[in-house]
């Protein structure tokens, strides 16, 4: 892979679900037989950084989601601290490029599903202090922030009133907004209400695979026109 990646490039995996396996006690510093990512294979593949997904299952209550998110964040810190010879946290682009100069893989944190925010922006502030740098607003179920792409009947018709507050506060804090898993209406609300570009951290093309998790050509063009980017998802069903 080295011939593809120059020293000027920064190769980023924008959504890595491997942290869920940290709860089982795996060591990312060693080659794993399960999963797709560990620090050994990331280095071999020329990956400069990855966003570890702090994922809370949609069936969790808000209280359960908070406890799960904090536990998973703690495990991510343990994993990076225990492999400081190969990895380091990055909370800004500058830190990421500095890590690359040092030969270290950057680990970013992104929260997948906003349920752990509950209905209190103080939780969002706390997660930002913990290192969260993007927020995937929902998963495969509506929540207190917005409508998901999966249930057919909408609850909010896009962002909820609290969801609009979350968008504004993420803009202020510097947390990127991720439209993956969101309904089409939520996507367009994000473009309308966010003052910063929106990302799709793990979405694919609806024209190639007609699945509600994917984005239409029009949505992809509108995202690009608003300065956003999409990272293609390699999940087979999409």
Walk through the language-model features, giving the residues of each.
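N-terminal hydrophobic targeting/anchoring segments and the immediately downstream early-domain regions
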Residues: 1-156, 210-238
């Amino acid at each position: 892979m080295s011939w593809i990646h120059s020293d000027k490039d920064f190769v980023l995996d924008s959504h890595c679900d491997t942290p869920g396996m940290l709860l089982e006690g795996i060591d990312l510093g060693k080659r794993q037989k399960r999963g797709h990512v560990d620090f050994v294979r990331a280095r071999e593949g020329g990956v400069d950084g990855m966003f570890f997904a702090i994922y809370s299952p949609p069936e969790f209550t808000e209280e359960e989601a908070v406890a799960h998110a904090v536990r998973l964040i703690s495990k991510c810190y343990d994993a990076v601290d225990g492999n400081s010879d190969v990895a380091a946290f990055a909370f800004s682009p500058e830190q990421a490029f500095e890590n690359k100069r040092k030969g270290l893989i950057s680990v970013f944190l992104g929260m997948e599903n906003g349920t752990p925010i509950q209905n209190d922006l103080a939780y969002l502030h706390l997660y930002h202090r913990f290192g969260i740098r993007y927020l995937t607003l929902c998963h495969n179920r509506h929540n207190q922030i917005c409508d998901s792409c999966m249930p057919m009947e909408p609850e909010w018709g896009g962002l909820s009133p609290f969801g609009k507050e979350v968008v504004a506060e993420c803009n202020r804090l510097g947390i990127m907004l991720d439209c993956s898993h969101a309904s089409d209406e939520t996507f367009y609300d994000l473009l309308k209400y966010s003052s910063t570009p929106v990302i799709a951290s793990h979405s694919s093309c609806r024209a190639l695979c007609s699945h509600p998790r994917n984005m239409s050509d029009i949505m992809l063009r509108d995202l690009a026109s608003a300065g956003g980017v999409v990272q293609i998802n390699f999940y087979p069903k999409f």
